[in-house]
Design a protein with these regions (language model features):
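Conserved loop-to-helix interface motifs that mediate assembly, gating, or partner/ligand docking
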Residues: 2-165
Length: 165
């Protein structure tokens, strides 16, 4: 057993570590809450956009667009969003689990999958698992902008129109 002084130093060290851990937990919690709030605002927008698109598609007029034509699904593109840091609890792990299951489902149906990871953690997981993926958009989630979203959307729309996804 150590001396009384060694024990006091060890206790002080543990308390210091606990304070640092608590501060890190508060910071990550605040960041997560901020991201969750932004996601909720986006969900409202997405629901309205979906309603508008459903209204357009159910209208009786002919909509001549390459995005509305029916075709056999042989290729898909998946843009998967995750964090670039690890202070998110199980967030990245849950996304990886869902992505793996989705990829496997498509592979079982002999459907080719193209991957577009947004976030360093999900890109690292894809790399470890041996998947090939587009690296152009990995960091756009760190500082989201309209321009980067348009760039990703244009790439995905181009792939769809050309039949590559």
């Amino acid at each position: 057993m150590g001396s009384l002084k060694e024990i006091k130093v060890r206790i002080a060290s543990i308390r210091s570590t606990q304070k640092i851990t608590a501060a890190m937990k508060m910071v990550s919690s605040a960041k997560f809450h901020h991201a969750q709030t932004q996601t909720e605002h986006t969900l409202t927008y997405a629901n309205k956009l979906s309603a508008i698109l459903n209204g357009l598609l159910s209208a009786e007029c002919d909509l001549d667009s390459p995005y509305t034509e029916q075709r056999k699904v042989s290729k898909v593109a998946i843009a998967v969003f995750a964090s670039s840091t690890g202070l998110c609890g199980t967030f990245n792990a849950n996304i990886w689990k869902e992505l793996s299951a989705t990829i496997q489902t498509y592979k079982n149906q002999q459907i080719e999958v193209r991957l577009y990871p947004i976030g360093k953690k999900i890109a690292d997981e894809l790399h470890k698992a041996g998947y090939s993926f587009d690296t152009d958009f990995i960091t756009i989630g760190e500082k989201p902008s309209y321009e980067s979203a348009v760039s990703l959307a244009n790439r995905l729309m181009e792939l769809f129109v050309t039949g590559k996804a």
